[in-house]
Amino acid sequence: MSIEKVPILGKETIHVGYGIQDHIVTEVVDNLASSTYVIVTDTNVEKTPQFSKLTNDFTKVLNEKRPDSRVLTYSVPPGENNKNRATKAAVEDFLLQQGCTRDTVIIAVGGGVIGDMIGFVAATFMRGVRVVQVPTTLLAMVDSSVGGKTAIDTPLGKNFIGAFHQPQYVFIDVSYLESLPTRQFINGMAEVVKTAAIWNEEEFTRLENFSKQFLSVVTAKNPDLLSIKEELVKTVLESVRVKAEVVSSDEKESSLRNLLNFGHTIGHAIEAIVTPEALHGECVSIGMIKEAELARYLGILPPVAVARLSKCLVAYGLPVTIDDKLFLQRVGPKRHNIEIDLLLKKMSIDKKNDGSKIRSVILESIGKCYQLKAHEVSKQDLTFVLTDEVLVHPFKQPPQENVITPPGSKSISNRALILAALGTGTVRIKNLLHSDDTKHMLAAVAALKGAEITTEDNGETIVLKGNGGDLVTCDEELYLGNAGTASRFLTTVASLVGKSESNDHVVLTGNARMQERPIGPLVDALRSNGSEVQYLNKEGSLPLKITAGNGLKGGRIELAATISSQYVSSILMCAPYAKEPVTLALVGGKPISQLYIDMTCAMMKSFGIEVTKSTTEDYTYHIPKGTYKNPAEYVIESDASSATYPLAFAAMTGTSCTVPNIGSSSLQGDARFAVDVLKPMGCKVEQTATSTTVTGPPRGQLKPLPHVDMEPMTDAFLTASVVAAVAQGDSSTTITGIANQRVKECNRIEAMITELAKFGVKADELPDGIEIHGIDIADLKTPSIEKRGVCSYDDHRVAMSFSLLSGLCKEPVLILERSTTGKTWPGWWDILHSKFNIELDGYEPPFGTDKEGTKASDKSIIIIGMRGTGKSTLSEWLASFMGFKSLDMDVYLEEKLGNDIKSLIKEKGWEYFREQEAAIAKECFSKFSKGYVLSTGGGIVEGAENRQRLKDYITAGGIVLHLHRDLEETVSFLSVDTTRPAYTSEVKEVWLRREQWYDDCSNYHFYSSHCNTEEEFDHLRKSFVNFIKIITGTEKASIPSGRSAALSLTVPDLNAISSQLGDIAVGAEAVELRVDLLKETSSSFIADQIAVIRKHIDLPIIYTVRTESQGGKFPDNKVEELRNLLLLGVKLGVAFIDVELTAPVEVIEEIIIKKGYTRVIASYNDIAGKLGWSNVEWTNKYNQGVSINADIVKLIGRASSLQDNLELEVFRKQNTLKPLLAVNLGSQGKLSQVLNTIFTPITQESLPNEDGLLTIKEINQIYFDIGGLTAKKFWVIGSPIQHSRSPNLHNAAYKALNLPFTFDRFESTDADQVYKELINKPDFGGLAITMPLKLDIMKYATELSDAAQKIGAVNTLVPLEGGYLGDNTDWVGITSSFTRAGVPPNPRVNGLVIGAGGTSRAAIYALHQIGCEKIYLANRTTSKLNEIKDSFPKEYNLEVLETEDQAEKAQNVGLAVSCVPADKPLDESLLQKVEKILANGEKSSNGFKSTLLEASYKPRVTPMMKIADEKFKWRAIPGVEMLVNQGDRQFQIHTGFTAPYDVIHRAVVEE
């Protein structure tokens, strides 16, 4: 038995060995005399053979040597959640009960939880007793057991209460690891890697080399630790030595010991959020990488060190990112809780901080920390490192001169790795690009056993010993991310691979984008040469399954090389290993990127194989058989494509930059960029054979480049494009020769055009290029953060290019997916920050925002459904709302084939038509994949190929929307439709055949009610648009911040009460559909019920299927039916879905994954009232709801006494992480229903009510009775106001909701009088303000809304704490009047405001909020209009129409607001202007009827309305609608309640 002793604090008290239980017992009994030895462990360790042996031996030896002493054992529950005050107290109570005294020796046997907590017990029991640590997990052995730190957790964080208490001994018996679960084993390696990373580079290198053997042993079904015993003991020993040395220098963590916290500042914060699902080491592993990236960002740690640390952690099976696949599986929905503000909050209360200043350990190199202490780091820098979105601030003071060395070339790096792996001998590769691409390539080479790979020079040099092309298959898929180069090179390499004992094929796969990128021509060439390659998903793209053992036949290979030169290079490099010499003929025209092909040939020559070009045939190469001979050293040239970014920075900012190792002799085509692009644009360029310097002209003086062929340097076109964006002159900049850029990481040409437009730069697509119309730097627009800034498309070159243009804007610019630059330049942002002095900020989007940046709304939406279900009409509505183009695929087919469908079927039959339909579907889904609504023919689901294509579209993240309506209505419509071919069978039969297909092939479903009137059509459109908002994420349902109620609809069929629904829903902010109480639960019936609600109520729908055990009617044993019903709710696009926490875990998880933008209410119902609110089970259920990231947690109990309600309120105050809906049912539970704030379940007298729910009137009355509501007085003020309808409106709402408020008139023209007599009274509730006080009353407003500020007047005043809020709701009256009249959101028309009075300013504000791109102003005189125009921001784009000619030229006006007096004759000159505009209204409306709103409500029909309606066929909205709608919003501001709209409308309109 070998035992290593490690000194700490001057004593050799740390003993390390394998199987040392006997030594532990002897050492303790001989040297630590005591009357009582207490062995404390947890219930897991208690069951291990090692623990049994330890306790048995202890008892035996104690009886022999100290017969008067006793040994006690005590077990605690396992897990971090039991490391708390309660468990500590339980241990202490046990010790006291057993009569333990100060001479007690406590032996803590277990993992970190036991060591920390029992050490703390020892530190405080009897003011301190002796403790011995016997760690049983790897993490405890190398970390928590050494150094004397003890602690317990609190709700606010880990280890906040504890003490330093050094153990008498630490006995590390590595044999305990034999029973350690694999995940715990790997977890401990994080701390091992950490200690080596901060202290011992030599040990770190050993760990790098040990990883593969370690992982293979610990992940085996029956791990054999004896096979790695020596290495394992050394691993523990070296880590312990580091910690012991550090602790000996700084026992109480005043300085040096802080180094042990590397990775913990961020890691602990993550752990606090995702514990217990994620383990300590897993979180610290992520923390180490983030803190290493921080050090790199600060310019201290080299990029290669970050890459090396990351690779080592991954090699031990540890996560290095929050979005690691396995980490995400483990933490589940808690991933959504990892938000930057919460992380920073957790970090700010870290123990090593200096007050609230966050401190972190900064790594300088592997094995060394910067200045041997923790450093204060800014929240700004931390936010940047912790987020994947970046705000690039304006380039204010960049250095005048700079020298930047880009990382190694990606192209050369990947080629060098392939050649070296296929070669024989050892090569030292220097300046290799350490990026995602090369990481995937290295991993693949290692997995295929192509080479032995090690590192030297602190990771700067890769030492690769090639196996001469002798590769074998591996069991796992080779995942390549979005590494296009690696995927193409490895496809041919995989064809050379031999079979292993366990596998006969290689699978290459990648991320979603990689699975869209083309590889077909290469596969075709390989197949023709004997390789067996199978597509596993989409034809022409990864994943690929390549059968091993076939190899390449050799001989002549023909390859299409007009798309990618990488296909050519892939075959070239592998050709020497074919069975016969290869002649590679490139067919289809001139190959793309010839210089890259030349590069490959030159590199092959460096590795001993010379390629010769054919002298008789163009684009043809002869490659001999042979084996590469690896050179002793190969230096990778810096990446010329990457070098374009710092050089372009100099060009755009008027500064100078030198790239010292890329010049005219470079192998890379992109080395020409400075000379061929920047120099003609006005830059001074100095280029030698090995270096390039660019000096830009004064900022803003770049010249456009009329034409440049960038075929030799296609990747650099993106950099050229952003330079051209700010190059002004007589011409545009035209770039050609870049057709291949459409099939890179994204369609780069399309991406460039789309993103440049966000900066106000117009660009046009050319057949093989792009034309850019540069603008003045001062005219650059700042892309909207709200609209998600600049999308990078997961493309490194897009992100880096736009980082340059962003800095020229006046405001910070948001760029998404910044980490995508890791493909070629992981440290690009660090260079911008540390070398160019650019301010960067991390950015985290608001919760619920699509973090991909490419919103669901960018992707085309496909519409399916039976003929006659409204596909054409609803498609137009959808296209109008989304800003998409609408394409009827039947019409497209007819145009393409030159024949109408009816004739086509008559002539050639249904089978031919279906074949053509399938071909058109394939074309359209690809060609029109973005920005379209694709309306399909009713029978598209008849063909299996089309059905699969629709399913694939859904899998790829697209929306396929199934539209349906009442079958009888459909039959009636089709019976008179003669424009389409007749069905070969009855309509009902066709529907029954297709019904399941429609369901299988769609992920959303909208059931449209039959409409008879224009009003019903308007309402249908509004409800349809609301549905679209939810399914596209354009607008998620809001969670009320104030008191709110939800009406529970408990009837078996809503059709029976449909006409009453508006009145029944008074007082509700949402309606709950109890699906389990419906008379049937077929999908069609439920869809009909949802349609009924949407037809009659404009409220969010809560979709609930309550099971029997939870108080409902749905059978508990029908789990699959429950799952299907919940998924149906998501498919129907409801705002909220109720998910019972008692449902099977797999059902809950599936709903969470597939919910889209529907919000989740996690519910639990204790219908029997068995649980009191002090029972821990309620807390467990609440936490369960939080853990699945529910939007609301709903807990329902049953009260048997008043006390139950009071306990519930205590519970409510204690649980605030997520909004809580908690009430008690039954007659005793009414108080809880009154005190609940979010979506309180309510009923109406006419509805069944078995649960004792209250009506909204009852709730408000009781709330008033107990003091929750106080009586308030509201007034309308101004003069004259005797005819004001505001009192009617507000008092009707107060009565309907039973609110203790009154609303009256107060006629006055004196604001001071109003303040004295109304505002300054204790019962003052608020004002509705009319002329002449809209301006005068503003002096009493301590805060103004944005609307009030821009409109320059207030019509609403309410008290705030310490002051008053002034608001203006006139604009809401305008916008709501338009939308309720059928005007869609984002109507994409221009607006017209008639008049120049006070209301005209509200109209301008309203039309801008609606989305009018331009707003025309017309009035009798224009002087006042010019004043109004000058007072609004430029982006309102206001144009004053001074003449009739100008009015006639006004374009695309579809909305108008008349703000001229209605009781006076219309001015003739003004009328002439208005009529010129109204006359063009029919062609201006964008899918809706052009609409005019009258601002005057007397008379009901004004002269302007008559002209608009009768003469020009515009829709005219009377002013009374504006009055109602502004009052609706005003009521909400006054009271916090939602106004009952139908009630207030009747009160005003029917007066």
Curated annotation (Swiss-Prot):
Binding site for NAD(+): 42-44, 80-83, 111-113, 116, 136-137, 158, 176-179, 187
Chain intervals for the UniProt region annotation (Shikimate dehydrogenase): 1271-1551
Protein's UniProt name: Pentafunctional AROM polypeptide
Residue segments, region Shikimate kinase: 858-1048
GO biological process, one term: amino acid biosynthetic process
Stretches for region 3-dehydroquinase: 1049-1258
Cofactor remark from the record: Binds 2 Zn(2+) ions per subunit.
Catalytic activity: 7-phospho-2-dehydro-3-deoxy-D-arabino-heptonate = 3-dehydroquinate + phosphate; 3-dehydroquinate = 3-dehydroshikimate + H2O; shikimate + NADP(+) = 3-dehydroshikimate + NADPH + H(+); shikimate + ATP = 3-phosphoshikimate + ADP + H(+)
CDD domains for the chain: DHQase_I, DHQS, EPSP_synthase, NAD_bind_Shikimate_DH, SK
Gene Ontology terms: cellular component: cytoplasm
Active-site residues (renumbered): 253 (proton acceptor), 268 (proton acceptor), 1194 (schiff-base intermediate with substrate)
